[in-house]
């Protein structure tokens, strides 16, 4: 544990006068009291050395054999027992200085030991961070949290939360807590429901996000709102998503445009990175990429811009081609996409077989490619192409001998996504700088999309976003061409948040829902309280809600979100430490007027 991670102002009492990680040569000769956990014990031929650990770090204790009772007691201590000691700070000899410890220039010669708590043998060691199953780590999370790396992750999370609060309060944001018990919404993920004892048959829902409350705060006249809000969604776990609950930095501002919000967020992320991390932001202000452009060039709306590959559109090249597979995908709504790997045209057959396997996993029927070798172009589709077509391709894509180009063809979105998946797959060929933070904004999302299953126009993302062009756009444009004031912020391929400038004008909202097939009565039934509020004086407003868990993950170089949460659930949405979820008594259910109707397999 580093001094930086756990620096404290000493609280002097009968247990301690100082902290382990903060002792140094400036304390030489002082009598001190320390309290903490036994990290390691070593018997070195007549001297017992104890590594004592507290929140700030480790300090080496020395127990001398002349003090027989102390020496005997020290020899009986187990790792992770909690002790308090008294002793004198002495300088280490030059050959015994430990540069890995903040207190490595001193040690404490012990004059008294008090055992506050004997520790039984642990389910896994703390001092030696051996590989331990996640199930065991989560069951004994209070022990796992003693380990240095995860302990520092939780400290870092606390400090970044405090830094966010300071930053926003300096910019006139007001922290407001919104309700945890609210009403269920049919949109989005599944709700966690809470039965009401006072209102039998009715349920509260835990909020998936404080979305409606924060917009109503704008209507209430609060100009800038934020909170670090718990959110609850009954959804499956992923490496970057915790099941059940997560925390987000929820923000909303009145009388703003999109650029105003971008300026606030970019400044905050730069401040946090510069002051709390060794990482660096490569481009500032953050690049802004339209949804159409990001799909065309990166095949995903969550691009990792560190990967030095871009997708090229080669559709016009195949309009009159004799290669019918590609020619048939040059009509409107379709595309032929290409991805060039420089200098990889001589890879083994296994390289291409693995790439094709990945393409099939992404939904492609196969993976067409052309290698440009010394002896000429090679590959499964070369025989279908003419010399002029091959030369035109070399010219457009600036191909050289030794390069290889991969293709995907089909509906525009499908072709983009397949090439985007291959871009990420080939990203492993490059050494990406883990300290580089490549942020970008994805903007200009389409307001509507065509729902193939329902055979109708539907909202593509957030139905409450303001359409670009407002009412005029809705009344005069093809719905599929209308763009929304929606935006995502992405870093290194991870989406940190979505946000939008909200639609605060009821007539525009009614019109947008009408295009998506909803009557005015349906809109009033579902969202009447919001529309009623907007009819009583609503300012233009917009917001965003970056995930705190994901932000800490990125800044701490963690691949799994459970490493930055103090008490996470496992992937089956279970808290193994607290044995949740659990059964409740029949009396509790009767009080709530609930009768269980379990699936057959659960009854056994």
UniProtKB/Swiss-Prot annotation:
InterPro entries: Aa-tRNA-synt_II (IPR004364), aa-tRNA-synth_II (IPR006195), aa-tRNA-synth_II/BPL/LPL (IPR045864), Asp-tRNA-ligase_1 (IPR004524), Asp-tRNA-ligase_1_N (IPR047089), Asp/Asn-tRNA-synth_IIb (IPR002312), AspRS_core (IPR047090), GAD-like_sf (IPR004115). One of its GO terms (molecular function) is aspartate-tRNA(Asn) ligase activity. L-aspartate binds at residues 187, 233, 461, 502. The keyword Cell division does not apply. GO terms for biological process: aspartyl-tRNA aminoacylation. It is found in: Cytoplasm. The keyword Transport does not apply. GO terms for cellular component: cytoplasm. It holds the Pfam family GAD. Its EC number is 6.1.1.23. Its main location: cytoplasm. ATP binds at residues 233-235, 495, 547-550. It is an enzyme of class 6 (ligase). The record marks 44 as: Important for tRNA non-discrimination. Aspartyl-tRNA synthetase with relaxed tRNA specificity since it is able to aspartylate not only its cognate tRNA(Asp) but also tRNA(Asn). Reaction proceeds in two steps: L-aspartate is first activated by ATP to form Asp-AMP and then transferred to the acceptor end of tRNA(Asp/Asn). PANTHER family: ASPARTATE--TRNA LIGASE, MITOCHONDRIAL, ASPARTYL/LYSYL-TRNA SYNTHETASE. This is Aspartate--tRNA(Asp/Asn) ligase. The gene is aspS.
